[in-house]
């Protein structure tokens, strides 16, 4: 894989001319120019190679044409706004000795014109050892990228009551996933595109997780009392105005990702494998988007003592940061999955429950002084 923090110039191996485009013109063509031409600007020559899934790249104009990217137009190369899932904007860059072959997703390769067509670039069928199809990628600038931090691999357990009946409201956030997202895939209305690629070619997407007390789950029970209660889970955030329009995917009710092309352009569909692997978020198998939900539950106190009960949910927080040497958070969405709901109580009878896994009721009754009838109810309820 080519370096992801480099700005490149792309020149033809046969004629030494450079791939260039014009400033301020939408859908302008990519042609070959002499580096010393009077009407050429340094930015016309600079390209950023954003890696995507399947070892392909999006070739992006660096600070020219508002981050326009290469796309195919009748076997010619134009630049246009990036659009997720647009196959004509995807390129494979294959090493060929000291140079590279640049192949479109349609199978044809970048070929320099000859003779009267010397300044043209076209897509043609690949031919062996054709110098007009060989390209030099010269690094002309290095971009500072953030260092990947240490990622936690296991979430801490949810809080439990202390022997005196105290309990925390939750646990501290743990960084469980981290990845870089190309700026062309991010809708950031607070920065213009030309500034964006020069200062923030990559955004940082983080996944934090932690336990938090579920709203409505705190229940006090008298001896031998049974109660119904309602707790909340899901998300209160309008996903359309946050993650969908910012990154081009949504979180569905099963906490999985569903990718789509956002109305504002961009989108991360082309790096969904990367997001799946580095953020540890599965693809959704549901059609219903995550919203705020209320869940009915019931708890029973089978003992002769008063009991308190509290439920905890795993909170997943996805946070997007603009990075230009320091981090500025521009998006956050927090969700909780009902499948993570866990209940703890006081007194929690933890010792008795553990003993019941490998001791008889009579043995546990003798050790804990909890009546056999109560132990049976505890086992029925908690197991």
Curated annotation (Swiss-Prot):
Swiss-Prot/TrEMBL GO biological process terms? sporulation resulting in formation of a cellular spore
Q: List the InterPro entries hit by this protein, alphabetically.
A: Ricin_B-like_lectins, Toxin_P42
What the entry lists under Pfam families is as follows: Toxin_10
Gene3D superfamilies annotated for this entry? Answer: 2.80.10.50, Homeodomain-like
Biotechnological relevance of this protein: Expression of the 2 toxin genes in transgenic corn confers resistance to WCR and has been commercialized.
Report keywords, A-Z.
Answer: Sporulation, Toxin, Virulence
Induction entry: Probably part of the cry34Ab1-cry35Ab1 operon.
Indicate the segments forming the Ricin B-type lectin domain, all copies. Answer: 26-138
**Quaternary structure?**
Monomer in solution. Copurifies from parasporal inclusion bodies with Cry34Ab1.
> According to its UniProt record, which protein family does this protein belong to?
Belongs to the toxin_10 family.
Q: What does this protein do?
A: Component of a binary insecticidal toxin active on western corn rootworm (WCR, Diabrotica virgifera subsp. virgifera Le Conte) and probably also on northern corn rootworm (D.barberi). Both proteins are required for maximal toxicity. The larval midgut epithelium is probably the primary target. This protein alone has no activity against southern corn rootworm (Diabrotica undecimpunctata howardi Barber), but it synergizes the toxic effect of its Cry34Ab1 partner. The 2 proteins individually and together form ion channels; channels made in the presence of the 2 proteins have higher conductance.
Q: What protein name does the entry list?
A: Insecticidal crystal protein Cry35Ab1
